[in-house]
């Protein structure tokens, strides 16, 4: 008789399972005999130990495994018969009341996958982003590269300006008391690079070698040094050297320093444009994909299995702890990480994953081999030996799978853009690149 699966609430289900004690014991005895052929028991030759002795030493473990196996088989038969897709693992509870002596009974509580309905794509409003790359962006990048290669020349009597390197001594106190990290001598930094807090840079601006200044500085509330975060310090700085940054000319020598073997400035600019366009394309794709996925998940109204959300939370906590370990954070395994901090995003990820999976199936958006190869070849252009990178990915199934997942998402985004209400929006270059 097929067990009856009961709906509790939402995606939660319950089913009663039973296995015969006789069937359990039959399998236990069979496994004990198999173990007995090779088991080493003190006082007996291998394979000659009495079955009763094997029962005492191996019986409990074997019986536990047999019951788990038989109950698991009964559970699979029950859900297969009911044509259910189980999300996560069932929770098994032994039953004793009203159960015959020759039967072991359990109640399995579990969740099922929801019926996922892909929303009407024509009703979705999404944004497709664009950023044109012009000569201005190429020249801007050239300026950044020149500044990175600036040579600093000491200027006597020069008042410091943005782009100058200053060398100074500083000492800070909070309520008249020095604090750790608040003092240094011969400390160099370049004004305008944002390495120091804005108030510190502003205080150093306009000073000449030999000049000093006393000023207050309030540390941000989220400052990395927790002992001074949110507090106001008094700093004294004394400038010892001001050096002007002299930028290199954009010439053959400069081009060669950036890897343009021929020293051809125009080819260098073309290479820079290609690199910018590649980076811009990747960032625009990310923004547009975010808009598409946000629209999908917002329109996807269905319950998600708690088991899948919990599993995602556990995975993200484990990844966060591993990242802390890599950064050398002590006691990374015991740092408090409440599950509720991750649960909202995990629920979104699970919902989106179910939606994307259903959309891929309905619209046949699976990644094609030629798409995967093209994406690998595009990705490989970021490296000095593109052919080796292509071979590296094609030779390993797991690495190819990573690219396949990216291509699949690209296919989903393209499909939604073809069918949704699309608003085009231009993003300023500086904003896109995080420079604004």
From Swiss-Prot:
Lineage: superkingdom: Bacteria
InterPro entries: PPIase_dom_sf (IPR046357), PPIase_FKBP_dom (IPR001179), Trig_fac (IPR005215), Trigger_fac_C (IPR008880), Trigger_fac_C_sf (IPR037041), Trigger_fac_ribosome-bd_bac (IPR008881), Trigger_fac_ribosome-bd_sf (IPR036611), Trigger_fact/SurA_dom_sf (IPR027304)
Major subcellular site: cytoplasm
Catalytic reaction annotation: [protein]-peptidylproline (omega=180) = [protein]-peptidylproline (omega=0)
Enzyme category, top tier: isomerase
GO molecular function: peptidyl-prolyl cis-trans isomerase activity; protein folding chaperone; ribosome binding
Positions of the PPIase FKBP-type domain: 163-248
Gene3D superfamilies reported for this sequence: 3.10.50.40, Trigger factor ribosome-binding domain, Trigger factor, C-terminal domain
PROSITE patterns registered for this protein in UniProt: FKBP_PPIASE
Family from the record: Belongs to the FKBP-type PPIase family. Tig subfamily.
Protein known as: Trigger factor
Native source species: Bordetella bronchiseptica (strain ATCC BAA-588 / NCTC 13252 / RB50)
